[in-house]
């Protein structure tokens, strides 16, 4: 019997987070839904959110038709990088939460790199 798509994704995410925690650097975690994209930067131990950005916020929402396209991912990536640098974080580990490194996830990561985050 096969496991569900979301269960498999969560299993991959759990494995990745174990490896990231060993690195001891803040973690950029991404959540993708059908309509929106969310990004959060957690402390090295994972106990606090340092910075967050998503497609529901007015800085990202302005000028967008919807929050599920590549332009929205680019805006979220740039905004999360700006907010991370504002609190003194420039080096992170990218946690794709079990999603394939493709599409909106890849675009968000590239935009964050272009805006100055190192990972």
Swiss-Prot record:
Keywords in alphabetical order: Ribonucleoprotein, Ribosomal protein, RNA-binding, rRNA-binding
Presence of keyword Ribosomal protein: yes
Disulfide bonds: none
Protein name: Large ribosomal subunit protein uL18
Residue spans crossing the bilayer: none
GO process terms (BP): translation
GO cellular component: cytosolic large ribosomal subunit
Stored SUPFAM superfamilies: Translational machinery components
Record's function text: This is one of the proteins that bind and probably mediate the attachment of the 5S RNA into the large ribosomal subunit, where it forms part of the central protuberance.
Ribosomal protein recorded as keyword: yes
Pfam families per record: Ribosomal_L18p (PF00861)
Subunit structure: Part of the 50S ribosomal subunit; part of the 5S rRNA/L5/L18/L25 subcomplex. Contacts the 5S and 23S rRNAs.
HAMAP family in the record: Ribosomal_uL18_B
Highest taxon in the source lineage: Bacteria
Assigned protein family: Belongs to the universal ribosomal protein uL18 family.
Molecular function GO labels: 5S rRNA binding; structural constituent of ribosome
UniProt source species: Xylella fastidiosa (strain M12)
């Amino acid at each position: 019997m096969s496991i569900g798509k979301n269960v498999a994704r969560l299993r991959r995410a759990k494995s990745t987070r174990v490896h990231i925690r060993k690195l001891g650097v803040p973690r950029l975690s991404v959540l993708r839904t059908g309509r929106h994209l969310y990004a959060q930067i957690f402390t090295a131990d994972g106990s606090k959110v340092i910075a967050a950005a998503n497609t529901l916020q007015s800085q990202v929402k302005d000028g967008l038709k919807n929050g599920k396209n590549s332009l929205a991912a680019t805006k979220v990536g740039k905004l999360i990088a700006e907010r991370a640098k504002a609190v003194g974080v420039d080096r992170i580990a990218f946690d794709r939460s079990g999603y394939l490194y493709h599409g909106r996830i890849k675009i968000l990561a590239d935009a964050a790199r272009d805006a100055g985050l190192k990972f």
